[in-house]
Amino acid sequence: SQLRWINLLLIPFSFLFLSCDLGKVELDNCQDLGNYTVDLPGIGFCPELSTGSVNDNIELSISVLDITDAAGVHAQVNYDASMVKIISADPGDFFLRSQKPIFVYEDDGQGKLDIYVFFMSSEKTNSGTGQIADIIVKLLQPGSSEVSITTESEILDPKDVKIPIKGFGTGTINAE
């Protein structure tokens, strides 16, 4: 009888303790608006703070935040060309549907990166929060530098009418 009580209590509690995984909390979930310091609707960086070593390549994502009926985005990014070099830019998943979105980027190598992404399918708009681009940058020298979304950035509806943007995000890149 006593053994039965031990089995009834010990086995379930063993599973409870063994199944609890207290792993790291993911603080850079790009879908969580709480991870951004940008007014909404807006465009921001995920993560807003990145750290790496000189000569490392690190990834930054550009996300649209709490937008409605977007058919396309032009995101202009200012960066310190003495501190980071743009290696590549690829489309995020926000405009990914049955067809891949049109995605073009232009880096002047002097500190300005323009990203254009828009629908070319029957699924004309998307709303919400999501990544529009994933950028790989190389850290050139030690120190801290800022990346920022400029006010030249635009979000457009299917008729090419600008959707108002309230927040233009900034990010910090630290190279050690």
Regions found by a protein language model. Give the residues of each.
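N-terminal secretory signal peptides that target proteins for export/translocation
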Residues: 1-3
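Bacterial N-terminal signal peptides
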Residues: 7-17
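Acidic, low-complexity intrinsically disordered segments
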Residues: 20-176
